[in-house]
C-alpha cells in the first residue's frame, strides 16, 4: 500500500474540505506530522502552544483540572477534530487540557500559517465558526444536564451520546468507557456511577461486554 502524502492527509481533515488542489499543495509544505503516545498532553490548560493540531487518528479527551487535581471530562475528540484554535484566535492560554487516550497522530499548523489560511480561505473561517458554535451548544447542554438531571439521568445521557446505532432497538458504545471516566463526565463519584450502572444492568437497560463496551436498550434508557 502506497504511503499517504501530506496532501492526502490534509484532504481527510474536514476543515480543509473547501480548499482547491493548489491550496492544499501550498499548505502541505507548511504543516508537520507528529505522533503522541497514549497519555501525552497535546495542549495543557493555562498554557499556550502557538499551533493548531489536526487529529488524523486516535482519540483524546478534553478536560479541566482544579488545584486539587480533580478532573472533569468535557469532550472526546477523534479523527478530523481540531485542537488549539480558540487560543490561536484570542491569543489567550488554553482553557482546557487535551490528553490522548490512545496513540494519536496529528498534523501541526503554526500560528502564522493558521492566520494566513483564515485570511485567504473563507471556508476555513466558516468551518471554525460552525465548530465553535457546536462546542458552545454542547457546553450549554452539559450545564443544563448538571443543573436539571439527577445522576441517573446524567449517566444515561453520557451513554446515549456515545452510542452508535446497532440493530433496530439497541445501540453499542463502541469505545471502552471506565466507571471513572463516566464519573468525570457527570460530576459524580466513581462509587455512585458504579451503583447507577449496576442498577441499569439489573433493570435490563444495558449490558456490559467483556471488552468494556456497552450494549444499550436506548428506547428503555430514558433520560430522567
Predicted regions mapped to residue ranges:
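Cyclic-nucleotide recognition modules
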Residues: 23, 74-137
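Short aromatic/basic micro-patch
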Residues: 18, 52, 76, 108, ...
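Phosphate-/nucleic-acid-contacting segments
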Residues: 151, 158-224
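Long cytosolic regulatory regions associated with cyclic-nucleotide signaling
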Residues: 1-6, 21-24, 86-87, 128-131, ...
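Cyclic nucleotide-binding regulatory domains
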Residues: 15, 40-102
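Conserved phosphate/pyrophosphate-binding and hydrolysis machinery centered on Walker-type P-loop NTPases
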Residues: 42, 48, 145-152, 172-175
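Short helix-to-loop capping/linker segments positioned immediately adjacent to catalytic or ligand/cofactor-binding
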Residues: 96, 115-119, 138-148, 166-169
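Cyclic nucleotide-binding regulatory module and flanking cytosolic helices
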Residues: 1-38, 83, 87-88, 120
